[in-house]
Amino acid sequence: MECALDAQSLISISLRKIHSSRTQRGGIKLHKNLLVSYVLRNARQLYLSERYAELYRRQQQQQQQQPPHHQHQHLAYAAPGMPASAADFGPLQLGGGGDAEAREPAARHQLHQLHQLHQLHLQQQLHQHQHPAPRGCAAAAAAGAPAGGAGALSELPGCAALQPPHGAPHRGQPLEPLQPGPAPLPLPLPPPAPAALCPRDPRAPAACSAPPGAAPPAAAASPPASPAPASSPGFYRGAYPTPSDFGLHCSSQTTVLDLDTHVVTTVENGYLHQDCCASAHCPCCGQGAPGPGLASAAGCKRKYYPGQEEEEDDEEDAGGLGAEPPGGAPFAPCKRARFEDFCPDSSPDASNISNLISIFGSGFSGLVSRQPDSSEQPPPLNGQLCAKQALASLGAWTRAIVAF
């Protein structure tokens, strides 16, 4: 979902377009539909993410109520190095539960798809945990070479291939001259030169800038970070930012519609977001810096109203009779001042908020006011899996669509 732009600035731009397109045919309806579709799409995605988290909690409760032998089957999917929290995220049970949604065919199919995605995720984790085995063998070989020599490598499960042949010289033995035949394994590399002696050559290897001992720990620490999304209970909810992320003072938001002017406005804590951003103490708007929507309000286009052509003709006739000053046209400053008076304001007055009517109800405000968890991760699932199940209990969204 494309959420690169700030939601508040996008809504302010849409409101300004709605206000400036009153003279166009179908302009108000076009921009209003675009704004409403954007708000409803964000609300729907947030609602679906909440449904994902609820389904995950129900599945965890069903797994806790099962006998212990079923839980041992779930733990068999986990890799030896995986944390216990990732192992608890077992395969989803498709039948036998007391939930009414699990007995429906659509819900059963959706849970089956979630089960397949979970198995793919576990296979990727197994592959990631089995891949860095040679690095661990190299570290074990470096530690066990002084004590046990080549015998220490044979005890490790995945290090049999790295054991040198019987005829290969060890580290303490002198090297023999080169002879034609099978070449032995290369000896361990000596410690690298210090950073001062390292030439600044782009063709130099990467090991010159960093010691070889620093690269394997950094690379070995990166694969265990992948099971983190499965360990958090609400990792289905992290993909879609909510309007509550834009600041603590903007937590309570209400989207309202003026039935007289057909203008949709976002009201926060009893005042407009534009008035809040105009102050220098606003924490979520860049310390009072004007956004992209406010920058466009600097230049106002010339608005024509009924009877304007006749007034301009009268003024031109009156200007032709008098003496023309050397600066230019005589009545140009007066016309410009009169046109600025009819330029619409970029933000409506705060006194008109009482005349605005809420269209989304308590359901929308209850969803957007929730604060997400700090440990959320983007979900690997598609948002269309539980669409039918989530849209079956929609109440506030249908009222919002009917209102338009």
UniProtKB/Swiss-Prot annotation:
Acidic residues bias (residue ranges): 308-318
Lineage: superkingdom: Eukaryota
Biased composition (Low complexity): 195-231
Biased segments, Pro residues type: 177-194
Matching InterPro entries: IER
Stretch list, region Disordered: 86-107, 160-231, 308-327
Database matches in Pfam families: IER (PF05760)
Similarity comment: family membership: Belongs to the IER family.
Record-given protein name: Immediate early response gene 5-like protein
Lineage per the UniProt record: Eukaryota, Metazoa, Chordata, Craniata, Vertebrata
Gene it is expressed from: IER5L
